[in-house]
Regions:
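Short C-terminal tail/terminal secondary-structure segment
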Residues: 37, 116, 126-161
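Residue(s) in the substrate-gating loop at a strand-loop-helix junction
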Residues: 32
Length: 161
């Protein structure tokens, strides 16, 4: 909770102080599709991301008149160092990819492109949560037992006795 909510909250407080003096700014916070979509065994993570989404909306509302825009980006599963272990399992990678209408999970380039748009002068958005997750929010994440079954079927882990 300290890393996922308290740290960003304190950072946002300081950032808004500086941007208020400058009468401009653009805040882009990374959230997660799990703020809205369930993922087994991730309650604290999901809750902190939902909390950050709400804090960003509050910042956008309270500081918009000072020229500050604030938005979040919500990736789904994205090929990054944080997910590297999970994606090494072909069964897990495939189980997650099947949940995405676009047929794949995201890349850091997908997230960077969204951030560039949000940071651009052409962006007339504030207080928004940009879902950059290949349509995952139209479906759902696989359940823990479904992931386990996929790994057993692929021979990656033994079946329980």
């Amino acid at each position: 909770v300290d890393l996922q909510f308290k740290g960003p909250f304190i950072w946002l407080q300081r950032l808004v102080e500086v941007m208020s003096l400058q009468q401009q700014g653009c805040i882009i916070q990374i959230s997660s599709a799990t703020a809205k979509i369930m993922l087994d065994n991730h309650a604290a993570y999901m809750g902190t991301k939902a909390g950050i989404d709400h804090v960003i909306r509050t910042v956008a509302n309270e500081f918009g008149e000072k020229g500050i825009r604030a938005n979040t980006i919500s990736p789904g599963l994205t090929d990054t160092p944080m997910t590297a272990d999970a994606l090494q399992s072909p069964a897990l990678a495939n189980a997650f990819a099947q949940c995405y209408p676009l047929g794949r999970y995201g890349t850091s380039d997908d997230i960077a492109a969204a951030a560039l748009f949000l940071a651009s002068e052409d962006c007339f958005m504030t207080g928004e949560n940009l879902q950059v997750n290949g349509g995952l929010n139209l479906r759902r994440n696989p359940r823990a037992h479904e992931l386990e079954e996929a790994m057993i079927k692929a021979g990656e882990i033994p079946a329980p006795e």
